[in-house]
Structure formats: C-alpha cells, structure tokens
Regions:
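An N-terminal assembly and electron-transfer interface module characteristic of large anaerobic redox
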Residues: 1-305
C-alpha cells in the first residue's frame, strides 16, 4: 500500500484561521497532516535563535513550529499572503514568511499565494497544490469547496455562539487580538483563565461578522491599511456599548497593532480599556496585577450603576 504524503502544519499564524480548510482539503485528496505541538518555551527559543531581533513574537513562534516539524514530514505548508485587494493588505510577515522558511530550512515547502492585485487567488493556489498529490482535478476542486464550506460553517457557529453570550447579565469583556495571539495557550492562557475564574464572559474580536466589523472600522478611519487590523478594530466599536470593558492584546513589536490600537483607544469613550503588550519575557505576576486592577474598576462601575 502506498504511503500517504505527510503535510506538516505549523501551529501558528493562519493555522488559527484556516486549519479546517487545510484539514478537509489535504485529507480529502489523500494526504495526512502532522501538526506541530502547542507552543512552549522550547519552541519560542528555537524560533528566536533563527530569527532577526526585529521579528515580532508570532513570527518567531512560527519559525519555532517549522523547526519542530523539520525532517518529520514530506512537505511543510507555508502560505504566502500579500493582499486581498488594493485596500486590504496584510502584515508583511504573511508575505515574507515563505521566503524566510525557504531560506532557513532544507525541507520541501508547500505554499499557495494570495495576491489579488496580481491575480493570484486562493482557488488557483489550492488547485496547484492539489494536483501535485492527486491528478483528479474534480476531486481537488470538490475538497477545496468542502473545506471552504466547513471552515465558514465553523466560523459562523462561533459568531452565533458569541451573539448568545451578549444576552446574559454577567460581566462581559471583549478581547481585541489576532487569533494567533489570543488562542495560543502559552501566550494568553493565563489571561483567559483569570477572566473565567472571575466568572466573566469573554468575547473575541475575530468572532464577529467580518463584513460588519470592517464597516465599523471604515467608519472609524478610511485609511486603515491592514485587513486583519480592520476586523479587530471594527469589532471594538461594534461591541463597545455591549461590554463592560475592552482588553487590547498585542505582541511585541507589532507595528500595526501599536499604531491602530492606540488610535482606537483614544476614540473609545465610556468604556474601560486596557492595553497589554506580550513578549517572550512578560512577567505573569505584573500582568495579573494589572488585570486585577482592571476588573476592580469594572466591578466598581457596575456597582455604581
């Protein structure tokens, strides 16, 4: 029996947005996926050792996950995302990470490009990848479409679940952060656990209808450059009257977040806001003290009506 092609999936960046698409597609065309383990200090150290000092923490973590997969699979999936149109760019790390990985590692790299300006669409990239492993183009197309449907269905289920949370009378906090930051247990697990231990409902900025979030972001500013920043910031204005507080979580040294979050914080009125920047040496004790003070302020506001 022919051995299945093993595709390595680094547990970082777009993993938190597109994993269901990747899983459905590659397993459907006869491949098997190998996930890197959850982020830990060893992975961060491995990524940091092969990164330039100016790299942001998520990029270092991503390289650490690639290092963890190196020599353990036939291909490593590293998408290259440039833009979703002239007014919807993405951070340069999504554009450059493929070239960085390709230069640092000897493994075979599998990728698809998204660059709407140059006519490079996701569909074409998946077809190109798929026929490498399965010559039946109809099967390749079928599992790409199935992957998109399942990925969107899962995303909409999260949006609907979050909408139901809004109906509760419990204290609610919105966390504004990129998925690869807030859902990384090693980076933000202690923050999430703290709010849950305090019996606070948590809402997430990526679990909002993206079109609605973008429309709110464009009302805030028509010059926002990055698509993912639009989605984050738009959600903060969409939810500002529905939550008791907003937590901005970003990683060091993210240039886009440092600018956009600061602009949003200045515009958000009548709601407590805290801005937290995480790096690989963030002290838990100091962070918890800040969160405790933030929650105390929110509770005092609720008690005073």
């Amino acid at each position: 029996m022919k051995r299945k092609i093993r595709i390595g999936i680094p547990r970082g960046l777009l993993y938190y947005r597109d994993y269901i698409l990747w899983k459905t597609f590659f397993e459907g065309i006869g491949c098997t996926l190998i996930l890197s383990p959850p982020t830990n200090k060893g992975i961060i150290d491995k990524g940091g050792n092969i990164s330039i000092d100016e790299s942001c923490l998520p990029a270092k973590i991503y390289l650490g996950h690639v290092k963890e997969l190196s020599q353990k699979c036939d291909y490593i999936l590293v998408p290259r995302i440039c833009n979703y149109g002239k007014d919807n760019r993405v951070c340069m790390k999504f554009n450059g990470i493929y070239d960085v990985v390709n230069n640092l590692f000897e493994d075979k790299i599998l990728n698809y490009d998204i660059d709407y300006i140059k006519g490079k669409f996701e569909l074409f990239g998946f077809i190109k990848m798929g026929i490498k492993f399965n010559k039946n183009i109809f099967k390749v197309l079928f599992y790409y479409i199935m992957g998109k449907i399942k990925n969107r269905k899962y995303y909409l289920s999260l949006v609907n679940k979050q909408d139901k949370i809004l109906r509760s009378n419990k204290m609610k906090i919105l966390i504004v952060a990129h998925p690869y930051v807030v859902y990384d247990e090693y980076l933000c697990g202690n923050i999430i656990r703290y709010f849950k231990d305090e019996d606070i409902d948590i809402l997430y900025s990526d679990r909002v209808n993206r079109k609605i979030a973008i429309s709110y972001a464009e009302d805030f500013s028509n010059t926002l450059y990055f698509l993912y920043s639009k989605e984050n910031i738009g959600s903060s204005f969409y939810y500002k009257d529905c939550v008791d507080g907003i937590v901005f979580l970003s990683s060091f040294p993210c240039a886009s977040d440092s600018l956009v979050n600061e602009l949003a914080i200045r515009k958000l009125k009548d709601v407590p806001v805290i801005n937290i920047i995480i790096d690989d040496s963030t002290a838990t004790s100091g962070l918890m003290t800040r969160l405790e003070s933030f929650v105390d302020i929110i509770k005092a506001r609720r008690d005073n009506g």
